[in-house]
């Protein structure tokens, strides 16, 4: 049973039936998974109450390749919804059809985008300030992917969540599916 359209997209497992995975176990599962895909490595893993989140980068370029979610109880690994699927010009679902927001003849899957990482950070800050006008907001350095940036942010000194900024349009996509931050581990 799911929690609805915007809720958890996987089967919730009550804690009394299945024990929650720890971050090290999730890292091992992710390493095994990406070893079958080829030239990728894990950049970071974050643990939230609803899932584990991982940034996967290309070994040869260091560029963000894609984002994955891991169910904290079953260990099922899935592509993260949102920008990872819709804006990712190289590994997303539009990589064969080209990006739907930009004419195909104007862009290919390279690392160049009209919006810089600093501009993406400013766009993210402005967006968050409109939602949390009285909070102390700090936006961390963005992770760069093919077509967009993903940024973690803090409210009042604590990691609160993340959002993505399209590198061509400046559109913001808030990651509402993670819930409360627990911990993170940087790997590269």
Where are the regions a protein language model picked out?
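Long, terminal "pre-/pro-" and other extracytoplasmic accessory regions
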Residues: 1-188
């Amino acid at each position: 049973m799911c929690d609805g359209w915007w809720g958890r997209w996987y089967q919730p497992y009550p804690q009394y039936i299945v024990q929650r995975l720890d971050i090290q176990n999730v890292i091992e599962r992710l390493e095994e998974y990406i070893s079958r895909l080829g030239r990728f490595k894990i950049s970071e893993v974050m643990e939230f109450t609803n899932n584990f989140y991982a940034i996967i980068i290309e070994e040869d370029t260091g560029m963000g390749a894609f984002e994955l979610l891991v169910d904290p109880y079953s260990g099922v690994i899935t592509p993260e919804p949102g920008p990872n699927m819709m804006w990712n010009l190289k590994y997303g679902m539009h990589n064969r059809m080209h990006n739907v927001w930009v004419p195909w003849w104007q862009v290919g899957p390279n690392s160049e985008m009209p919006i810089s990482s600093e501009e993406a950070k400013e766009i993210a800050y402005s967006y968050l300030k409109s939602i949390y006008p009285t909070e102390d907001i700090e936006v961390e350095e963005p992770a760069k992917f093919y077509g967009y940036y993903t940024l973690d942010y803090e409210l009042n000194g604590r990691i609160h969540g993340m959002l993505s900024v399209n590198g061509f349009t400046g559109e913001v996509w808030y990651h509402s599916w993670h819930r409360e931050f627990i911990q993170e581990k940087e790997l590269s």
